[in-house]
A protein has these predicted regions:
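Active-site loop segments of alpha/beta catalytic cores
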Residues: 1-51, 63, 68, 75-83, ...
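A contiguous, low-structure linker/loop signature
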Residues: 83-114
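A diffuse structural propensity rather than consistent per-protein peaks
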Residues: 114-115, 315
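Conserved small/polar residues in nucleotide/adenosyl-binding loops
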Residues: 367-372
Length: 379
């Protein structure tokens, strides 16, 4: 790669440390452009003529993302990655869900013809769109930045997008055996889809993920089950945990998105998944964001369980107290940055903790996975 990020090697080293529960990453979700010197003279495309072009025209999006990354700050560990997301849980659209472009996001509506059959159609237009979008972005990137993996999602969340949340919750009682079978079918399709998209976006073995703008030296994914706020611990261990575990066993680097205080009771089941590398915490509506002292004990519990953490929307005034309380190893900070002055302030704060964070050599880590993979690894 001839990347626009001049310190990419240092950032990759910090990511490898973090996957191995060491050190600090200073990043942010998405990017900002305020007072940023462009990395290249990339003109902005003409404004999208409508929402359909804004989201579903691969060439327009590739041109827009090329301009976007070229004009975004890449200081600290902010990654050069094009966000190719096609809505949260776009695997559901690949399986028949209906796309609707909004002003700020893409909605995926249930398939009106869904009949409980989980079928992958390689000719489905939504699947073709995924591939065409990533190929267009990869060609436009020209090695200057990563093309991110879309937010596919998995499991119950995908099924809920296909048929509706209420129906999935009823299935846990009315047809649990069928539901288990569907979870395995979705996982099997997930791996097929993931592998094909990975082969489009990969840089060597490396890749980046759109959600949380993250990087890994091999295959990585963000996993979740937002519907789990509405199910019991027993149901989680039956309908979620086994399939998350399979993903963690087959994908080298995995981050679980734990969303909302209503999902916290599933943390013990997550910590039981030995192969899971890290957990991201989203407090949810009405709660303080990830840098709040309210979550210190949660982060400590995750770290003590052998997982790295990702804290999101941390503000500058929260940064030092957070690190003082939870330590400086295995901590990924998704900061609430608005300009490069704030990034530089945060870098100075984090530098104070670098000596207390154990160094791990890149060469060693590339060959010693934090969660040993057996021969079933998809690397």
């Amino acid at each position: 790669m001839e990347t626009w990020k001049t310190n990419l090697d240092e950032t990759k080293k910090r990511y490898i440390d973090w996957w191995n529960h060491k050190g600090i990453i200073l990043n942010m979700w998405e990017h900002f452009q305020e007072d940023v010197k462009p990395h290249a003279d990339i003109p902005a495309p003409s404004p999208a003529k409508d929402l359909n072009q804004k989201w579903f025209d691969p060439q327009w999006r590739a041109e827009y993302l090329d301009w976007y990354v070229a004009h975004s700050s890449l200081k600290a560990d902010i990654l050069p990655v094009a966000n190719t997301q096609l809505g949260p849980g776009s695997l559901a659209a690949i399986l028949g869900g209906v796309f609707e472009g909004g002003e700020d996001t893409i909605w995926i509506h249930p398939d009106p013809d869904f009949n409980d059959e989980i079928v992958f159609n390689p000719e489905h237009p939504n699947w073709i769109l995924h591939k065409e979008l990533l190929k267009a972005c990869k060609a436009k990137a020209n090695g200057h930045y990563y093309v991110g993996m879309p937010d596919l999602m998995e499991g119950l969340d995908v099924l809920a997008a296909l048929k509706g949340t209420d129906k999935v919750l009823l299935d846990t009682v009315m047809q649990p055996e069928v539901l288990e079978q569907q979870m395995q079918q979705i996982n099997d399709i997930y791996f097929k889809v993931f592998d094909e998209l990975y082969d489009i976006i990969r840089e060597g073995d490396e890749m980046a993920f759109c959600y949380f703008s993250s990087w890994a030296p091999g295959k990585m994914s963000k996993l979740q089950s937002d519907i789990s706020t509405m199910i019991s611990e027993d149901d989680y261990r039956r309908f979620v945990q086994p399939f998350i575990r399979e993903q963690c066993q087959k994908i080298d680097y995995t981050l679980y998105h734990l969303d909302g205080v209503g999902a916290m009771h599933h943390l013990p089941a997550l910590l039981e998944i030995e192969e899971l590398n890290a957990i991201q915490w989203t407090p949810g509506v009405g709660e303080p964001q990830g840098g709040s002292p309210k979550w210190y004990d949660l982060y400590k519990k995750i770290l003590a369980g052998g997982k790295s953490i990702m804290a999101c929307w941390v503000t500058l005034d929260e940064l030092k107290p957070l690190l003082d309380n939870i330590g400086a190893d295995g901590v990924h900070l998704e900061m609430d940055f608005h300009n490069e002055r704030e990034v530089e302030q945060a870098m100075r704060i984090v530098e104070e903790y670098s000596s207390s964070s154990s160094d791990v050599s890149k060469d060693c880590l590339l060959y010693t996975s934090p969660s040993p993979r057996d021969s079933t690894s998809s690397r």
